A protein has these predicted regions:
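Cross-family detector of peptidyl-prolyl cis-trans isomerase
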Residues: 1-133
Length: 133
């Protein structure tokens, strides 16, 4: 039996404020809101809302909010960008976290769209809506 824990309050799309200074070379996370629900762990299936911007410009390149459809994936399953997958681990349902992803854990040399140049550092603000345990 899988238990799914869902956040009760409906979050709204966040504004992404770029961190100060140079782009970090390592994955960095900062909890903007600490959730009090179940913890996202490898093997669990999470539902998140997110906004992604490039560190260099602050321009939004993707947002699940615009589609009104949360992104659902298995933690550690390879469906999400590596840095995003690693960055949500330990996060709790109801939380909001800023995740700064260096190129090697993002798209690297690839440019998946005109909005994401090669070697881009990515900034995500993620709301963890639910996770299975």
């Amino acid at each position: 039996v899988e238990n799914e824990e869902t956040a009760t309050s409906g979050p709204t799309k966040p504004e992404v404020a770029l961190p100060d200074g140079d782009a970090p070379t390592e994955l960095t996370t900062r909890d903007l809101v600490v959730g009090d629900g179940a913890e996202a762990k490898p093997g669990g299936v999470v539902r998140i809302h997110y906004v992604g911007v490039t560190f260099a410009t602050g321009k939004e390149f993707d947002s699940s909010w615009e589609r009104d459809e949360p992104f659902k994936f298995a933690v550690g399953g390879g469906r999400a960008v590596k840095g995003l997958d690693r960055g949500i681990r330990g996060m709790r349902v109801g939380g909001r976290r800023e995740i700064v992803v260096p190129p090697r854990l993002g798209y690297g040399k690839q440019s998946p769209s005109s909005l994401i140049p090669a070697h881009s550092t990515l900034v995500f603000v993620v709301d963890l809506l639910s996770t299975t345990t």
